[in-house]
Each structure stands twice: as structure tokens, then as C-alpha cells.
């Protein structure tokens, strides 16, 4: 049995893991940089260990310091959260070599999915649909998308529409990939013009059994980075959703996946009108990648399925079996990421004088329709420049999608946020569009969307 968990992370995700551990009677250990010493996650842990310095390379990316902290504080397991070392197979191996429990997939699974080129080959062998293009790229293959094999988040990614631009764009993508990931390997695949981003949550026991907890729609993106996530994917027909779930299950089972993971797909709604009735046509969806960790957007799945994904991670890490969920989808959940950033999406820093978002729950389930807020900050905290600028995830859960949207807009309008500029108004504008309300968006929709001006809450203006 796990008795004490060190979370090799910071902020909101550390608090999220601590919340499940407290409920289960498991003690917790935080590691923190100097800049993070005053943040809530440090105070909430049973034990806190300083990692001298501020830059990630000095602190949260120093695997040897984190393992030493776990040994020194008597932790018997390490949870990586997301980002930092969460998908570093060598760190996972080092954790296990130190005699500690790694709350995550086997290092071999991380390796298998770490390279997009190798992952696509493995998924094709498992019978999961993938995007392919001829090599070399022919005149009839355009438009195409150049992608970094080792990365994500839009870095090392270029859309090419003309053959004469291919070499130059490939060189730019390779340079971006080297800068961001230390690996300039890129590959080319067809570019789907009107696509949606749909992902499936899986939890595996490491022995081939895999539970599927439905799909999430992460189509609203900015520069290939997710802005809004929701579950279930309302625009996906039931037969396509079932096919996505089965493809994700096969993907995870093929690598004997252990723990929580997400299989991401590109969904092409236009392919449905071109296919024949009576089944899901070829080309309806394609494998993109598998994230071998807990996702930022996991709360929407937890709310509609009534499940604690961190608890399941802990259960699998302890070697316990998985039980099928008692119920299916209940209602609709939508999550927005509240960032300290200006209208040009430039990260902001400074003292967060006030952060007051009315919530019915934090880091856990909702008893009824309402708002959940998962945040790494509180009023009075300092927002620094060393890490991601996300202040909070604001999640709405309701019986219907329209009610969830209304609740979320109201919560954002009524939120009191002072001291740093945020994207709060931008989020309200997106949620208030007719396109979003009708669920008629694509992965590039936000680039040209006609956004209405955010309407302030009159009670706050008075």
C-alpha cells in the first residue's frame, strides 16, 4: 500500500493530487522552487522540500533532487503530474530503480509513445487509423502538415499548401523542434482543413485490460494549444464515438498501458457525409498521439463520469485491479483555462491582489450542477515568470451543454480578479459566440472568429 506520495510538480496539479491523497488517508510531500515557496500547494502538503533556484532546469526538471527528496522524507511513491518530467521515461526508470513506486505508465510505454513517428507505426500495427502521405510528397498531396516527432503544443508545426514552399517550411519546423525539444526530427502528414480535436480517456492495468471513460472535445484552440475542453463531445455521433473508444482501447491495450492516459484523434466531420450509411466511413478519424500522463483537462471527464482519475492512478500503481464504472455519461462539463496574459497572449506577472471565483467545489466532485475551480493560486500570491501562466481551471457541470455554458459565463463575469491582466474577457467572448453555442467550430475557428465584446456583470460595475 502507498502511504506517502511525493508530487514532482507544482501549483494546481500538485493540489489536485494532494486532494485525492488526503481523502484516501495518504500523506503528501511537496517539492518547490524558491519562487513557489509561498504558494498554496506548499502549505497543503504534509512535508515540503525546497529545490534551490527558480528555473525549471534548476528545480522541477532535476530528477535526482526529486528522488533524493522522496527518499529523505520517507515517500514510497512519486506522482509526476503533467509537464516537467511526467513523460520522461528515464526519470520513471530512475524512480523505480530507487525502490520507489512510479505512479504512471511503464517506462517502455512512455518510450513507445514519445516519438510521434514510432507511435504512428505502433498504432498502425494495432489497427488504429493513422494519417499517411506519400514520400516524397507529391503535387496532389497538398495541403500537408509538418510536425515535430518529439513535441507538441504547436511548436515545430507548419502548414504547407504549395510544393515550392515545402523545403523552406520543413527547415523552419526542424529549427523550431531543435529549439523546443532538442530533436529536429519532423514528419509530414495530410492536413485536414475542417477538423476537430477529439480525445479519449483511458485507464489501463498494465496487463492489457483497459477502461474507457468517454471522449473530450478540445477543438477550440489557439496556435494549436487548447483553450476550451468539454465532455462529452456533443458533435460526435454515437457510432463514431463508439469507434473512437474502441480505437483508444486497442491503442492502450497494444502497449499494455498502465495508469491514466489519453489517446488523441483528429476527427473529420466532412468524411461522414461522404461515407455510406450503416457504419463509420474510413477517414472519419485518425490517431494523433497518446499522452502518457494525466491531462490538464481531466476534470471534465471526472465530472460527467463520476470518477476520480487520480484515485484510479493510485489504485493501479498499488497493483489493484480495475472495476468497470457503475454509470455512463451524466450531463455535460466544460473547462476553460484562465491565464495571466494580455490581449496579444503575452504572459503577465505581478502580485495577484484578488482571485475570487465563486465555486461549488475545488479539485473534486460536484454534488449538483455548478462550478468547480482548480487553481494553483490564491489572493496575494505572486505570479512569476519562470513557469506556465495558468491561474486556474474553471469547470462548469450541468445537465445540458447550454446550461453548462451559461453557468460558466456567469461564473467568469462575476469573478473578482485584480493585480494581473487575464484572458477572462476573451474566454467570455468565445463562450458567447453563436458558433460555439451551436458547436460549429474547427481547430482553426478561433483564428478568424467574430467575437462579441464581453458584457460585464452589472452588479460588479455598480
Residue spans for each PLM region:
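N-terminal beta-alpha lobe that positions the nucleotide/phosphoryl donor
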Residues: 1-263, 267-291, 295
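Catalytic cores of soluble metabolic enzymes centered on carboxylation/carboxyl-transfer
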Residues: 299-302, 307-462
